[in-house]
UniProtKB/Swiss-Prot annotation:
Keyword NADP: no
Name the UniProt record assigns to this protein: Chemotaxis protein methyltransferase
Gene from which the chain derives: cheR
Ranges where the CheR-type methyltransferase domain occurs: 17-282
N-terminal signal peptide: none
Organism whose genome encodes this protein: Thermotoga maritima (strain ATCC 43589 / DSM 3109 / JCM 10099 / NBRC 100826 / MSB8)
Cross-referenced SUPFAM superfamilies: Chemotaxis receptor methyltransferase CheR, N-terminal domain, S-adenosyl-L-methionine-dependent methyltransferases
Taxonomy of the source species: Bacteria, Thermotogati, Thermotogota, Thermotogae, Thermotogales
Keyword Transferase: yes
Length: 282
């Protein structure tokens, strides 16, 4: 039983300052997951359940509320919904993460695509705050191929997409970025942050997209989806890889994170082109 001893008010909501914390029954968590999908379209059941439960209950502890009270907060105030979406999705990234793999794209894979394509179509799936698609765009500029390239960048989280479109980053996002790229493609702001130049931004199109629910575009030459799929349940992972394969042109490439492997890649019509880079052969 929860005892209400005193309350504090934040915005329109009252929070119990002496909330008696308890472990919530599993059925309350499952109810919450279903309500979130029904009301907001976020399918949490395809994520690893312990990760979702842990992150949600950290927010419940923060506000000293239960699942039902918290759902009411999400419905009535977009600020809490944005915070929840940010906690549930994966938004930790940097420019040129695992740089040796990006140099393989620059030196071999993108030139190979360009040789065989009049127009190049790339997709950064689960793009977070934009570091990944902008990394791609920088490589395209370095190869003087921006005139024939379109980069689609998608994420489920509207908040991070807004940050991506703004294109302003803290210095810590550039730990793997060559100095010449930083000087050539970014403008340093008075507060020490960096803003991506418009010449890079203009070939990237940002769009909200739910990998688990929304239809996929077709005929991509390259799909980059790194450190996103690891958070999904095995069934959802397999379905995503199948849909990525269907979205690629024959000969197209799928670039995944350095902790991700597609064990049934042959069944999906892939070959291992390089470690963590798969090529569609069917």
């Amino acid at each position: 039983m929860q005892e209400e001893r005193s309350e504090k008010k934040i915005g329109p909501f009252k929070f119990q300052s002496n909330f008696e914390w308890k472990e919530f029954p599993q059925e309350e968590f499952e109810w919450f997951v279903k309500e979130v999908e029904k009301r907001f379209g976020l399918n949490l059941s395809s994520y690893k359940p312990q990760r979702v439960k842990r992150r949600t209950e950290l927010l419940l502890r923060k506000y000293n509320v239960g699942y039902r009270e918290y759902l009411n907060m999400l419905i009535k105030d977009k600020k809490y919904l944005d915070e929840f979406m940010d906690k549930m999705t994966i938004n930790v990234t940097e420019f040129f993460r695992n740089p040796e793999k990006w140099w393989e794209l620059r030196d071999e894979i993108i030139p190979l695509i360009a040789k065989n394509s009049l127009r190049m179509k790339f997709w950064s799936a689960g793009c977070s705050s934009g570091e990944e698609p902008y990394s791609l765009a920088i490589l395209v500029h370095e190869l003087n191929l921006s005139y024939k390239t379109r980069i689609l960048a998608t994420d489920i989280d509207i908040g991070v997409l807004r940050r991506a479109q703004e294109g302003i980053y803290e210095e810590r996002a550039f730990v793997s970025t060559p100095k010449e790229y930083l000087e050539k493609y970014f403008e340093k702001l008075p507060d020490g942050r960096y803003r991506i130049k418009d010449s890079v931004k203009k070939i990237v199109e940002f769009k909200r997209h739910d990998l688990l629910k929304d239809p996929f575009e077709k005929n991509f030459d390259l799909i980059v989806c790194r450190n996103v799929v690891i958070y999904f349940e095995p069934e959802a992972k397999n379905e995503l890889y199948r849909k990525f394969a269907e979205s690629l042109k024959p000969g197209g490439f799928l670039f995944v994170g350095n902790t991700e492997r597609i064990f049934n890649y042959k069944e999906l019509g892939f070959e291992i082109y390089k470690p963590f880079i798969y090529r569609k052969v069917k």
